[in-house]
A protein has these predicted regions:
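A short acidic (Asp/Glu
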Residues: 9-11, 87-94, 112-116
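Basic, amphipathic alpha-helical segments enriched in Lys/Arg and hydrophobic/aromatic residues
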Residues: 200-223
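Gly-rich Lys/Arg/Thr-decorated short loops/hinges at beta-loop-alpha junctions or inter-strand turns
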Residues: 42-49
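Short, conserved catalytic/metal-binding motifs centered on acidic residues
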Residues: 1-6, 36, 76-86, 101, ...
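Active-site beta-loop-alpha junctions of metal-dependent nucleic acid enzymes
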Residues: 50-72
Length: 223
């Protein structure tokens, strides 16, 4: 996952230390951190962490994280990635490494694109072709899930979800994909708890700030 922590100040040694994004906590400047959380024996652990610089691509970040897992001897059964990683370069990286995954497909615009998957009457499995002017086309397996919930979703109590997937057993039904992906929601809890225990500093040094984030995740793991 990728998280941005608001930063009020100037860069320490290089402008790449600061990422600009949507305003939060009175600033558009952030320090970025990428991490990997795993679930083992029904317990969640953060096992990899790195600082993210301005201009780094999602593909670079994902490749580094999986290389890190390999270097420390951790193998994964399936990766659950945030929709922010859903792009042709990242998907190609996952396919090339033969990684099984479930990843939401971002829905943009009012028609066309991923929204075409929502024209059916019920959930189903299909394929989808991503088109990138820079990185070309890529065909992936996809699952469209129609969820019903009284008073929870708009549009007469229904809402569609779309996922790019790889390596799913044939017996897995679309609604099960939705439930499987919900397993990653605990990542948000880990970041929230990390921020609760993270020591604050006035230092502009990104190495020190990365250390404090890492120590906070260690406390989370121990807890």
């Amino acid at each position: 996952d990728l998280t941005l922590i608001p930063y009020h100040g100037e860069h320490y040694a290089d402008e790449k230390e600061i990422i600009r994004s949507q305003p939060k906590s009175g600033t558009t400047h952030f320090h970025g951190y990428a991490s990997v959380s795993i679930v083992h024996d029904n317990q969640r652990f953060v096992v990899a962490l790195r600082f993210v610089e301005k201009g780094e691509s999602m593909q670079e970040i994902v490749a580094w994280l999986f290389d890190r897992l390999k270097s420390i001897g951790i193998s994964i059964k399936r990766a659950y990635l945030d929709k922010g990683f859903c792009s042709v370069p990242v998907l190609k990286t996952l396919q090339r490494r033969k990684i099984k995954f479930i990843m939401p497909m971002p829905v943009r615009g009012k028609s066309g694109g991923v929204r075409k998957l929502f024209e059916a009457s019920a959930s189903y499995k299909t394929t989808y072709i991503f088109n990138s002017p820079k990185h070309g086309e890529l065909k992936v397996s996809a699952v469209a899930v129609k969820k019903y919930s009284k008073g929870r979703y708009q549009r007469k109590g229904t809402r569609w979800f779309a996922y790019a997937v790889a390596g799913l057993p044939k017996a897995v039904e679309p609604h099960q994909v939705f439930e499987l992906y919900r397993q990653r929601f605990g990542i948000e809890t880990s970041y929230r708890q990390m921020n609760q225990v993270r020591a604050r500093t006035t230092s502009r040094n990104p190495v020190i700030r990365l250390l404090l984030v890492g120590l906070a995740f260690i406390l989370f793991n121990l807890y």
